[in-house]
A protein has these predicted regions:
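Hydrophobic/small/kink-forming positions within alpha-helical transmembrane segments
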Residues: 82-86, 90, 117, 141-149, ...
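C-terminal-most transmembrane helix of multi-pass membrane proteins
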Residues: 2-13, 55, 319-363
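Loop-to-transmembrane alpha-helix entry segments
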Residues: 167, 183-203, 207, 224, ...
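Helix-helix packing/entry segments at the starts of transmembrane helices
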Residues: 107, 163-169, 248-260, 296-330
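Transmembrane alpha-helical segments that form core, pore/gating elements
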Residues: 212-274
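Membrane-interface interhelical linkers
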Residues: 2-83, 97, 113-139, 212-220, ...
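Cytoplasmic-side transmembrane-helix entry/capping segments in multi-pass membrane proteins
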Residues: 74-80, 131-142, 186-199, 221-226, ...
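Juxtamembrane helix-loop-helix junctions in multi-pass membrane proteins
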Residues: 83-112, 237-260
Length: 363
């Protein structure tokens, strides 16, 4: 009799001697181990994007803070350079009473060249300039040398304070030259600070068309005044060139400036038929050495300062030179400085302080 169809669904027990099938082992699909280590809730894509934006923003903030610290350091370098240049000006003024301005330029260049070469060798710097910077460096050396000669002649014939402040009018020109050639943005506050300092310069120089004649101070020769103005214009050009040479090592740039200056001063001595005079007086010898030594230190820090800061803003800090010179004019040289000169020095400091305080608030 055939089995009925409803019995086909009944499970029959296995006979005792039938082989038992081993239980299936739970094998992990590839990737399960990695999935176990992952968090239960995956971060969504917008959250990852948000994190990357935060990281990018923090990186930008760090770079901006570093840039601000670097620029603040550049301002400090320029102020310290101004202090050294004021010492050099005192030495030059004293030496000019004994020798000509051409001799003073020669000794200043030679002494500074020797000191810079020794320091460059000590720092193991190669005095080699890339070909793309040689033209700009040559122009910087020539213009700078012309400016130094004009400045030295003006300082030897004028009251030191008046000569220095006329030379220090260069920042106003530098602001506009920097905007034209370096594409530097002119900040309104910084420009206002420069104009304020320039007003202070006017109080110190007291031009005849604005001020009555001052009987206390002596009248400067017209040629000396023109030389001081020429030194101011050449300084503005040099500041722009220093910014364009920011990739050149400062010791290398200074070295060739002193080389060109030394060669030019030798040619000037020969053409002008100046007989060299060396007085063996300790104070005079110190003045000659100091004119080179302090100029060397000042050139290092002013070059580094202009490589770090915008040309227009950095040049305004050169107004601090006037404050140093006014103090040394009275204390060291004993020259008469009018109350208007002191008022002008105060106005200059006010203009410079506007820039310094802005930099401090950025930190």
């Amino acid at each position: 009799m055939a089995p009925s169809s409803h019995r086909s669904g009944v499970v029959q027990p296995l006979p005792p001697d039938a082989p038992r099938r081993a239980p299936e082992s739970k094998t992990k699909v590839s990737g399960d181990a990695e999935n176990e280590e992952q968090p239960l809730l995956q971060a969504s894509e917008p959250e990852n994007v948000h994190k990357s934006e935060i990281d990018r923003a923090s990186s930008i903030i760090k770079r901006l803070n570093l840039l601000r610290m670097t620029r603040a350091k550049g301002l400090g370098f320029i102020v310290f350079a101004g202090l050294n240049f004021s010492f050099a000006s005192i030495c030059i003024k004293y030496a000019s009473h004994r020798v000509t301005s051409h001799e003073t330029v020669f000794w200043r260049m030679v002494i500074a060249l020797v000191l810079n070469y020794i320091w460059a060798r000590y720092k193991k710097r190669k005095l080699v300039v890339e070909s793309k910077y040689r033209g700009l460096l040559l122009l910087r050396c020539v213009v700078g040398t012309v400016g130094v000669n004009l400045q030295f002649y003006a300082m030897s014939k004028m009251v030191l304070t008046d000569a220095i402040v006329i030379v220090s009018t260069s920042p106003i020109s530098t602001f506009f030259l920097g905007a034209a050639f370096l594409k530097e943005k002119i900040n309104q506050v910084d420009l206002l600070a420069g104009i304020t300092s320039f007003i202070g310069v006017m109080f110190v120089t007291r031009p005849a068309f604005l001020f009555a004649s001052d009987t206390i101070t002596k009248q400067a020769p017209p040629l000396a005044t023109y030389c001081a103005i020429g030194a101011s214009l050449t300084s503005a050009v040099v500041y722009i060139l220093l910014r364009q040479l920011s990739k050149v090592d400062c010791l290398v740039s200074i070295h060739y400036f002193f080389v060109v200056g030394t060669c030019t001063s030798i040619v000037t001595l020969l053409v002008m038929k100046v007989s060299m005079t060396i007085l063996l007086e300790p104070i005079f010898l110190f003045a000659l050495f100091g004119s080179g030594f302090f100029s060397f230190i000042g050139q290092i820090f002013i070059t580094k300062g202009f490589q770090l800061e915008q040309a227009g803003i950095a040049s305004v800090m050169r107004y601090f030179d006037v404050v140093f010179v006014v103090a040394m004019d009275v204390l060291v040289l004993g020259e008469m400085v009018s109350l208007l000169s002191l008022l002008g020095a105060g106005i200059i400091m006010a203009g410079v302080s506007m820039i310094v305080l802005r930099r401090a608030r950025e930190q």
